[in-house]
Swiss-Prot record:
Belongs to the formate--tetrahydrofolate ligase family. It holds the Pfam family FTHFS. It comes from Methylobacterium nodulans (strain LMG 21967 / CNCM I-2342 / ORS 2060). This is Formate--tetrahydrofolate ligase. One of its GO terms (biological process) is tetrahydrofolate interconversion. It comes from the Bacteria. The gene is fhs. NCBIfam families: PRK13505.1. It catalyses: (6S)-5,6,7,8-tetrahydrofolate + formate + ATP = (6R)-10-formyltetrahydrofolate + ADP + phosphate. GO terms for molecular function: ATP binding; formate-tetrahydrofolate ligase activity. Its EC number is 6.3.4.3. ATP binds at residues 65-72. The lineage of its organism: Bacteria, Pseudomonadati, Pseudomonadota, Alphaproteobacteria, Hyphomicrobiales.
Amino acid sequence: MPTDIEIARAATLQPISAIAEKIGIPDAALHPHGRHIAKIDHAHIASLEAKPEGKLILVTAISPTPAGEGKTTTTVGLGDALNRIGKKAVICLREPSLGPCFGMKGGAAGGGKSQVVPMEAINLHFTGDFHAITSAHSLAAALIDNHVYWGNELNIDVRRIAWRRVVDMNDRALRSITQSLGGVANGYPREDGFDITVASEVMAVFCLARDLADLEARLGRIVVAETRDRKAVTLADLKATGAMAVLLKDALQPNLVQTLEGSPALIHGGPFANIAHGCNSVIATRTGLRLGEYAVTEAGFGADLGAEKFIDIKCRQTGLSPSAVVIVATLRALKMHGGVEKKALGTENIAALEKGFVNLARHVENVRRFGLPVVVAVNHFHTDTEAELATLKALCRDKLDVEAITCRHWAEGGAGAEELARAVVALAEGGAPKTPNFVYPEDAKLTDKIRTIAQTLYGAADIQVESKAATKLAQFEKDGYGKLPVCMAKTQYSFSTDPNLMGAPSGHVVAVRDVRLSAGAGFVVVICGEIMTMPGLPKVPAAEGIHLDANGQIEGLF
């Protein structure tokens, strides 16, 4: 089988105007970026508001492993399959970050014959949205220090500046820095640090904003510091929001591309689900729903992270509700959850599969807590055996009363996911609730919201909140932010805060190390265990295998 990039490069792509025509977008509403990528004009997006919305399909997964689950691949394959069976489907994805592309994960445009293309452009600079978000965030950082330098009229306490800097790269050396060294002309030295762009509150605001006006209003609510008498300082106080909105104006228009089979795909925004809320932009999701009968979207990492935040943050803020949920699993990953090392995953092991099944079972149970119909997509690998597939399907049927469907979209494209597509249509047309069940009520205390997630979804005995975090939570409550939802930042590899504790651990304690207010986005970030908002590169980063060949073509971007 050729590599992903070889498959993508061999494809004959349709002009982006032809893709737009399929979903009723006129040429005049497109801002082309070359022949195969375009942004959709703000005015056209606004003109769609009166149109009825289609059905929303959420794709999530089991807890990820190094064996890979293929959630984006399945999202693309399902969208292609829905179009193949006569449904009008639009795929809605997040934009990849450069950090993971050059780090451990590699590209994030799907795989095999279920990809969005042009994959090199999508995985790298794309339309410059991340540059715009990084620039807007950096402008805010510069304005804060500039305000202090020129007299500090707002009385900002430089010890309590919460606004860190960002860059779209995995770079552990930037986690903690000292800035403004070199003399008085460079400002007031203080401790600072960098996060990755996808963890920026600007990214979260970008993805949750309804339109340009809402974007600017949300930017203005962002709290960046405190005064010496402990009053909040916002970006509106610093008069930063107008210039930031100008930087983000064009970026806020969703990006239209295509799959290998010519299905329309909107790729827009890209917060991680382990350190942010993990969903593509509200604007793109709503646009997909108004342009198609079905909008197929994904939420990052496992259902304990991305799906929970999709429901408790994105749906709570917007009124969206999935008509069906797909949980992606692989036999390989389940066997790894059952204790098998990666090098042995190609060998049949029914006992390990049965042991690792508990991870899938908990994710299914958690999705059902949201009150949503669910189906399991078994992303097929060539090493899977019929006995293993039969075992998993029987476990799902007998223990969970859920259908598990073998999907071969990686090798066969949309044709390999038609059975899944028909099952999704049956679930969606069966009638899902207009509002999902949220994990916690809005008026619960912030600490109780964290505890409820930990005990209900993670199987934890309790939470342990460090004193610094407890003090900040109490202050957030006092300042009127107690009704905000919480955004859990923790390892994606486990229900616990220990990435090595696989399967479905119970009775553990979730350690809350810190909390951060995201008043503009409308949630409180809860930093658990050793999770970092600036990742580092692995010992052998993917960047080492990426290069240009003699003809100037990119190689190694898998």
